[in-house]
Amino acid sequence: MNLNKQENKHFVDLSHTVEHGMITYKGLPAPLICDYLSREESRKHYSEGTQFQIGKIEMVANTGTYLDTPFHRYAGGLDLSQLPLSSIANLEAIVFRANHPLRREIDASIFVDSDVSEKAVLIHTGWDAHWGSEQYFEGHPFLTKDAAQFLADGGAKLVGIDSLNIDDTADLSRPAHSILLQAEMPIVEHMCNLGALPDAGFKFFAVPVKVKGMGTFPVRAFGMIEYVEETKRGQTEQG
């Protein structure tokens, strides 16, 4: 009997859509999206029947689902152009479920007995359900200092969360950002759909544009789940 392995890939989109006028974080301006060259205006540059649109966007780096590099926190840290692809693409990933409605703090106990080394650690709080509402900006879940230190000591590759901020915004020292980015561990914030992922056994990608001199930029974050099926090949047995 021969076995034929068939690989099927399933992709889970983990990013919010960036739209004109949306607010990601109170106090930061919304993106402005418009035509730089409209289809109508482009017609004079091309043959009859040929037209294009060239878009223009004005936005702050912290828009939508975005990734922080060490440069976001530290002047001498790696910026977007220096970040190795090995730290943001094709990462073995693990999801920790922290969607407790009455508990904001996510401490190190959630990671106990887990091997986070070389993995993308994704923290599923369910807070993305409030995206686009006023509630999203108030009382969000966050990672405590000891939890961030556990991930840094454990050698995690990247940390992501589906919340407003990985830190408690009332703590102006931003301990989670400080610890993780000092350890050269990228952070992805404002994620979504983490509930659609398995706890482990998938790859994670969050790749921003390669920009020099910037520490943050939106990403198209996604998980890739591979299913391997074994099917029997017909084979005649002679008696």
What are these regions (language model features)?
Residues 1-239:
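Active-/binding-site microenvironments in catalytic and ligand-binding cores
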